[in-house]
Amino acid sequence: MIITANHNPIRIIGYPESSMTQEFINEIGKTHQVEVILPKDFLKDQSTDYQYIVAVTVDFDERKQIINIIDNNKLAVITVIHDSSLVGSAPPAVIQPGTFIFPFCSIALGSYIGRHCVIGPYNLIGHYSRLGNNCVTRPSVVISDKSTVGNNCIFNIRSTVTNKVSIVDNVVVLGLTNVVKNIESSGRYAGSSARRISDS
């Protein structure tokens, strides 16, 4: 487990009953003491005595609100990379603060992952691909080489993005969807050749 952090205590912002929160506790707790703070309590107390990571992923509006507060107040965040994941080094992959990378991922050389992302297990982020801030990928997602993904995007289980595809902000790709061409409008996409099915 690789954790980039300072010496302050760690708070996971999330719900104790959430499986995502429990995954964060299990991994970070192997080497650090952690406590969970509910989102409503964080909104009342953004103490600079702590460093944070955001485990809220179901209510995406709530997640974005929390992240905006963290960034606007310049609160310290931690970055977690599971030691079973491979991260390219020449040229290096760049992983921004606040991101959590689950086990058995391959983060290829020259790739870039923005702030506050959650990269699910068994993901492949291809060579020179770029993910914006606050992207969440579920298990077994593939983002192929030289693709660009905007901010606040969600990729559900076993969805794929083919080479050199560009995706705008605020896109949800449903499970088993294959994105083969650029996505130029935000919304929800599904199908073997991704098509837009709703606004959000």
Where in this protein do the model-derived segments appear?
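Domain-scale signature associated with acetyltransferase and cell-envelope carbohydrate enzymes
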Residues: 1-133, 141, 151, 169, ...
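Glycine-rich hexapeptide-repeat left-handed beta-helix
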Residues: 138-200
